[in-house]
């Protein structure tokens, strides 16, 4: 049935075309010129074209009716008995933009050729100019000096190699050739070793200490010999740095000199409080956590003003950090307020065998107002190794004074107490009995002639004088003023387990001391 409908549709179309041809012939005869008639056969007026297209558009298969057969001769029409209706005998029909042959209606896709997919070849021209495509560009950075001097291909490694280290020069280059030429020119002029190229994955930028970051030479890459096992890509970093490493005398002297010579230029993350004998650090926001840790271990910190994320104190002892976090969350309403850590500390004491005494701290936590830094002044540093014990006694006396002043404060909350550290904050309520006992226990354990790890008569007599002023009593057996001064320090070997003796500090005999304290 579908084929019959298609044939009937073709028949209707041909009849319309035939009527159009007849109209053209009549028009040509009326003009009286056969030549003009031939030309007019190839011209179609817009009016006639619109008539044909409108007729085709409104035509539907339901309107098709059978045409009666024509048997009379002489009429200008096709003979239905002749085989002139075959597709090969039909003329092409213009049905749109494409010239369609009637036979195409019987072919697949109505005779419209479908283009085949062409195979890709290397000669295909790109759709756009390749010069407009942006390719990734690698910059090269030359760190001329410092503990991590070299040529880097990553800005993150370069920043880590230069951040926090004063006096380091670096520059960016577009190519490795320019970077190498600049590095060689610098090393030649300075008569130093040739700088190495350090790829991104091979940079070792974590020095052991802040002091070593400024003084130690760059380390060469370690070559590990493995048999049947894969070399680890990097050493697993610990979650946090423990406080186990002991500070050495060289580290302390370096930090002491740094504080005395610091004038505030080039670093706005810290300032110093300068006294006659010692300069203490005051760390502000964005201070180097590694330096804060080492200054804390050296007993050279007066105040810390940390950020809200407490990144400056992340390397301090864990119990101290936890006490600060609990203060922010439990003791103040607005946790976004700035806080401070005010520290009173002793300094370390060394002997020939090593570290004898670690610093002891009393830390006060509170809400900070606007920080007004004092002017840091470059002070003259004349301290010698033999003067360290005298400086330790001076800081020990100040530590005892700060600890005894807690007796005058009636509203104190103890945040944390350990063998060598007491952390407290102000409270709106009176001190509870539990916190008062914790303070008294800490005072009895710490305040003695052995505060610095060895028996020091100067500390004993200072405690006695201070307690007497407050109305208490402090008794020390076998320790009098006559033995508190050493006239010939060179001839005195000092106590067996104490530091090297200095003038007017340590007695000649290591006498055990028993003490008792009563404070009204």
Swiss-Prot record:
GO terms for biological process, alphabetical: regulation of translation
Any Pfam family matching the protein: Cauli_VI
GO cellular component terms given for this protein: host cell cytoplasm
Keywords noted in UniProt: Host cytoplasm, Translation regulation
Places the protein is found: Host cytoplasm
Keyword Translocase: no
Domain of life: Viruses
InterPro entries per the UniProt record, alphabetical: Ribosomal_bL9/RNase_H1_N (IPR009027), RNase_H1_N (IPR011320), RNase_H1_N_sf (IPR037056)
Stretch list, region Disordered: 486-520
Protein family (similarity comment): Belongs to the caulimoviridae viroplasmin family.
Function: Enhances the ribosomal termination-reinitiation event leading to the translation of major open reading frames on the polycistronic viral RNAs.
Further remarks about this protein from its record: The inclusion bodies are the site of viral DNA synthesis, virion assembly and accumulation in the infected cell.
Protein name: Transactivator/viroplasmin protein
């Amino acid at each position: 049935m579908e084929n019959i409908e298609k044939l009937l549709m073709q028949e209707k179309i041909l009849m319309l075309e035939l009527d159009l041809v007849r109209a053209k012939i009549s028009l040509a005869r009326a003009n009286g010129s056969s030549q003009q008639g031939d030309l007019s056969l190839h011209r179609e007026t817009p009016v006639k074209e619109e008539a044909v297209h409108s007729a085709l558009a409104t035509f539907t298969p339901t309107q098709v009716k059978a045409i009666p057969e024509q048997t009379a001769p002489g009429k200008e029409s096709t003979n239905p008995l002749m085989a002139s209706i075959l597709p090969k005998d039909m003329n092409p029909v213009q049905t749109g933009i494409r010239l369609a042959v009637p036979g195409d209606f019987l072919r697949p896709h109505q005779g419209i050729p479908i283009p085949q997919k062409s195979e890709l070849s290397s000669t295909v021209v790109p759709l756009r100019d390749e010069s407009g495509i942006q390719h990734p560009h690698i910059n090269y950075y030359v760190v001329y000096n410092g503990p991590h001097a070299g040529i880097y291909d990553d800005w993150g490694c370069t920043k880590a190699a230069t951040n926090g280290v004063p006096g380091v020069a670096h520059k960016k280059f577009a190519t490795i050739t320019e970077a190498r030429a600049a590095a060689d020119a610098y090393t030649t002029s300075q008569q130093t070793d040739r700088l190495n190229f350090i790829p991104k994955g091979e940079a070792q930028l974590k020095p052991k200490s802040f002091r070593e970051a400024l003084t130690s030479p760059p380390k060469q890459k370690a070559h590990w010999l493995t048999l049947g096992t894969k070399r680890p890509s990097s050493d697993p970093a610990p979650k946090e740095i423990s406080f186990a490493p002991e500070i050495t005398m060289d580290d302390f002297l370096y930090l002491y000199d740094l504080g005395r010579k610091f004038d505030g230029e080039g670093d706005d993350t810290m300032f110093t409080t300068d006294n006659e004998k010692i300069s203490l650090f005051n760390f502000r926001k964005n201070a180097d956590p590694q330096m804060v840790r080492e200054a804390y271990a050296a007993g050279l910190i007066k105040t810390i003003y940390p950020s809200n994320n407490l990144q400056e104190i992340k390397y301090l002892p864990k119990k101290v950090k936890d006490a600060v976090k609990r203060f922010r969350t439990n003791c103040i309403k607005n946790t976004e307020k700035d806080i401070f850590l005010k520290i009173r500390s002793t300094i370390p004491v060394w002997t020939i065998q090593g570290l004898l005494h670690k610093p002891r701290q009393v830390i006060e936590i509170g809400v900070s107002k606007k920080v007004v830094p004092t002017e840091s002044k470059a002070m003259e540093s004349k301290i010698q190794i033999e003067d360290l014990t005298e400086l330790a006694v001076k800081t020990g006396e100040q530590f005892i004074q700060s600890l005894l002043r807690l007796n005058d404060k009636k509203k104190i909350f103890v945040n944390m107490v350990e063998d060598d550290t007491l952390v407290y904050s102000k409270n709106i309520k009176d001190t509870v009995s539990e916190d008062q006992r914790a303070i008294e226990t800490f005072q009895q354990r710490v305040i003695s002639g052995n505060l610095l790890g060895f028996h020091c008569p100067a500390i004993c007599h200072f405690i006695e004088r201070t307690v007497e002023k407050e109305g208490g009593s402090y008794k020390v057996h076998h320790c009098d003023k006559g033995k508190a001064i050493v006239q010939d320090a060179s001839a005195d070997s000092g106590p067996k387990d104490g530091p090297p003796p200095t003038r007017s500090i340590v007695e000649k005999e290591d006498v055990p001391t028993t003490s008792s304290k009563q404070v009204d």
